[in-house]
UniProtKB/Swiss-Prot annotation:
<keyword id="KW-0139">CF(1)</keyword>
<dbReference type="GO" id="GO:0043531">
    <property type="term" value="F:ADP binding"/>
</dbReference>
<keyword id="KW-0375">Hydrogen ion transport</keyword>
<dbReference type="GO" id="GO:0005524">
    <property type="term" value="F:ATP binding"/>
</dbReference>
<dbReference type="InterPro" id="IPR033732">
    <property type="entry name" value="ATP_synth_F1_a_nt-bd_dom"/>
</dbReference>
<dbReference type="InterPro" id="IPR023366">
    <property type="entry name" value="ATP_synth_asu-like_sf"/>
</dbReference>
<keyword id="KW-0406">Ion transport</keyword>
<dbReference type="Pfam" id="PF00006">
    <property type="entry name" value="ATP-synt_ab"/>
</dbReference>
<dbReference type="GO" id="GO:0009535">
    <property type="term" value="C:chloroplast thylakoid membrane"/>
</dbReference>
<dbReference type="InterPro" id="IPR020003">
    <property type="entry name" value="ATPase_a/bsu_AS"/>
</dbReference>
<dbReference type="InterPro" id="IPR004100">
    <property type="entry name" value="ATPase_F1/V1/A1_a/bsu_N"/>
</dbReference>
<comment type="function">
    <text>Produces ATP from ADP in the presence of a proton gradient across the membrane. The alpha chain is a regulatory subunit.</text>
</comment>
<dbReference type="InterPro" id="IPR005294">
    <property type="entry name" value="ATP_synth_F1_asu"/>
</dbReference>
<keyword id="KW-0472">Membrane</keyword>
<dbReference type="Pfam" id="PF00306">
    <property type="entry name" value="ATP-synt_ab_C"/>
</dbReference>
<keyword id="KW-0934">Plastid</keyword>
<comment type="similarity">
    <text>Belongs to the ATPase alpha/beta chains family.</text>
</comment>
């Protein structure tokens, strides 16, 4: 028989212990209800105290961002497809804003807009995080741009130089080689101690894979992070991708390193933002873009900077890409981004189709930093180049109507055609600065005038090889002194004269 002798004092003491151990903890959660969901947008009732840009979490685990606070509901954009979110389900405010983990381990990886790996190489270890949207450096924490960011493309480094901490727009129609200019610049940073971030927004996954492939083949992934949101990604993630890229680049910039970030391209980000805004029923403005589309891009591009010496002189150079329709630079997004950036590289479809590649229109491309972002050697040889090309373009237009031209004009036209050849380069073949100096010197000083126009490009390729193998001291002088000294000029003249004889003999 079971002993049923229960002692009341034992019961009361155990109850007393339970009561003493009880902590009255009230957890306040801001909860709302889904009124409507669809097209990547959710309207939520409740959530009274939600902040603009705060993350909200749905019952199925989907995360959204609260963007619209109206009198009776909150409009949130979803960071997923939202197919399993049901009307009437609950939503809770997280009290956080969008943040991403950051670390050196991101180098060589392909991630999405939430900094999650999408390259199948496993998780990325990270000990700290940064907000996706962070304020741009103030005036005191910046200094003026003075170091060159070499792109490896003669046309840019000689006439439209880019400096570390500058924002240089690459603009042109589709299929004019905008991405090629950007990727060549990344390839040229090998060994320059520059961290590169390539942000692909709303592109075909195959195009992104091709770019990543090129980087891997050329060993550029060692210092590059790729942030990709393909065309089939939700608009919210396409809109966030550039800010994620900027946050990753800032992590390195504030650690006294130099970074280069490419946004490919901001037209697609603006379209994703327009889609979100229209679905949130925000009033449309010009070209149906919302009123704050300028702020969308200005707050992104203002994060590029050259840090002051107190902050360690790190830098973040931004190259946004914008696509134009039929060369119309006066559309809304192109004019906005032109006014925010420190210059633009304009790629023309006509030049591209005429076989001038990179198809840079030197006439209307500018760099508002200018020669401050060039080494002395480049300033010395490239000074006359832009002027000569501009005069040639003017003469060429005139020569179409005139039949008999005097000898001086014919010579100027011949020189101009050869200078145009000198600017042509193959894709993924960036040139070191000493090779560029040698190439420009050859053209500007008339050494290539003896050659036929179609021989110029081949001659210059061989000349660069000849100098590298037979006159290595030329490259050493330019690299060490950053100046085009008299000694360097004599070595170069000698090399050109020797090689021109060889070349003309071979061609016969």
């Amino acid at each position: 028989m079971v002993n049923t002798n229960i002692r009341p004092d034992e019961i009361s003491s155990s109850i007393r212990k339970e009561i003493e151990g009880y902590t009255q903890e009230v957890k306040v959660v801001n909860v709302g209800t889904v009124l409507q969901v669809g097209d990547g947008i959710a309207r939520i009732y409740g959530l009274d105290k939600v902040m603009a840009g705060e993350l909200v979490e749905f019952e199925d685990g989907t995360v959204g961002i609260a963007l619209n606070s109206e009198s009776d509901n909150v409009g949130a954009v979803l960071m997923g497809d939202g197919l399993t979110i049901q009307e009437g389900s609950s939503v809770k405010a997280t009290g956080k804003i969008a943040q991403i983990p950051v670390s050196d381990a991101y180098l060589g990886r392909v991630v999405n807009a939430l900094a999650q790996p999408i390259d199948g190489k496993g998780q990325i270890p990270a000990s700290e995080s940064r907000p996706i949207e962070s304020p741009a450096p103030g005036i005191i924490s910046r200094r003026s741009v003075y170091e060159p960011m070499q792109t490896g493309l003669i046309a840019i480094d000689s006439m439209i130089p880019i400096g570390r901490g500058q924002r240089e727009l690459i603009i042109g129609d589709r299929q004019t080689g905008k991405t090629a200019v950007a990727t060549d610049t990344i390839l040229n940073q090998k060994g320059q101690n520059v961290i590169c971030v390539y942000v692909a927004i709303g592109q075909k996954a195959s195009s992104v894979a091709q770019v990543v492939n090129t980087f891997e083949e050329r060993g550029a992934m060692e210092y590059t992070i790729v942030v990709a949101e393909a065309a089939n990604s939700p608009a919210t993630l396409q809109y966030l991708a550039p800010y994620t890229g900027a946050a990753l680049a800032e992590y390195f910039m504030y650690r006294k390193q130099h970074t280069l970030i490419i946004y490919d391209d901001l037209s697609k980000q603006a379209q994703a933002y327009r889609q979100m805004s229209l679905l949130l029923r925000r009033p449309p403005g010009r070209e149906a873009y919302p009123g704050d589309v300028f702020y969308l891009h200005s707050r992104l591009l203002e994060r590029a900077a050259k840090s002051s010496s107190q902050l360690g002189e790190g830098s973040m150079t931004a190259s946004p890409i914008v696509e134009t329709q039929a060369g119309d630079v006066s559309a809304y997004i192109p004019t906005n981004v032109i006014s925010i950036t420190d210059g633009q590289i304009f790629l023309s479809a006509d030049s591209f189709n005429a076989g001038i590649r990179p198809a840079i229109n030197v006439g209307i491309s500018v760099s508002r930093v200018g020669s401050a972002a060039q080494i002395k050697a480049m300033k010395q040889v490239a000074g006359k180049l832009k002027l000569e090309l501009a005069q040639f373009a003017e003469l060429e237009a005139f020569a179409q109507f005139a039949s008999d031209l005097d000898k001086a004009t014919q010579n100027q036209l011949a020189r101009g055609q050869r200078l145009r050849e000198l600017l042509k380069q193959s894709q993924s073949a960036p040139l070191a600065v000493e090779e560029q100096v040698a190439t420009i010197y050859t053209g500007v000083n008339g050494f290539s005038d003896k050659l036929k126009v179609e021989q110029v490009k081949r001659f210059l390729v061989q000349l660069r090889e000849y100098i590298t193998t037979n006159k290595p001291q030329f490259g050493e002088i330019i690299r060490s002194t950053k100046m085009f000294t008299e000694q360097a000029e004599n070595i170069l003249k000698e090399a050109i004269e020797e090689h021109i004889e060889l070349f003309l003999l071979q061609e016969k």
